[in-house]
Design a protein with these regions (language model features):
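Short, small-residue-biased leader/transition segments that mark boundaries at the very start
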Residues: 1-9
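Short active-site neighborhood of thiol/selenol oxidoreductases, capturing the structured segment around
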Residues: 39-58
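Rossmann-like NAD(H)/NADP(H) cofactor-binding core
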Residues: 50, 80-82, 104
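Thiol/disulfide oxidoreductase modules built on the thioredoxin-like
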Residues: 97-103, 108-156
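N-terminal "domain-start" segment that seeds a small globular fold
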Residues: 12-40
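Structural microenvironment flanking redox-active thiols in thiol-disulfide oxidoreductases
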Residues: 61-100, 110-116
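Alpha/beta-hydrolase fold active-site loops
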Residues: 47-48, 79, 127
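Short cysteine clusters
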Residues: 7, 57-60
């Protein structure tokens, strides 16, 4: 795709796993930057924006202010943004402080990209964002840095779906 900036991990870093679906996303239990285990299923029934990213990924860093603004603007409409970071807890914690991230950031390794691949990220690039409607169905996907207007469009569609 021309003009899309992403960061990709070398293919040898992506591990094989069983078939993943939206249920596999909800089944994830990952630590947050403070080491507390968080179940993605706690956000079931809300519009869930799962953003796969890394601290070393420039396009990921570029989209963060728009994601922070979207969380603030859309929270009252039942939207929850969750960042799934591919990095160490310390780096993610420092990033959250420096960028004033106001939504949950979870910590994982590159194996979580298998879930992203089965949710439509065949390129394995970052950032990758999946929007799930309240019923758990995929409402939207985006590979590359999101702009505010793109996020708002994805969320308007997802919140309108029953």
């Amino acid at each position: 795709v021309t003009g899309v900036q992403t960061c990709a991990l070398p293919i040898w870093q992506v591990f094989r796993s069983a078939k993943a679906t939206t249920e596999a996303l909800y089944a994830l239990q990952l630590p947050d930057a403070d080491g507390r285990l968080q179940a993605v299923a706690q956000w079931r029934g809300r519009v869930l924006v799962a953003n796969f990213w890394a601290t070393w990924c420039e396009p990921c860093r570029e989209e963060m202010p728009a994601l922070v603004a979207a969380q603030q603007a859309w929270r009252s409409k039942g939207v929850q943004i969750v960042g799934i970071g591919i990095d160490s807890a310390a780096k993610i914690r420092d990033f959250a402080v420096n960028y004033k991230i106001s939504y949950p950031l979870l910590v994982s390794g590159p194996e979580v990209l298998d879930v992203a691949r089965h949710l439509g990220n065949s390129a394995g690039g970052l950032p990758y964002t999946v929007v799930l409607a309240r019923d758990g169905a995929v409402s939207g996907r985006h590979l590359g840095a999101l702009q505010q207007g793109q996020i708002d469009s994805l969320l308007a569609r997802a919140t309108a779906e029953a």
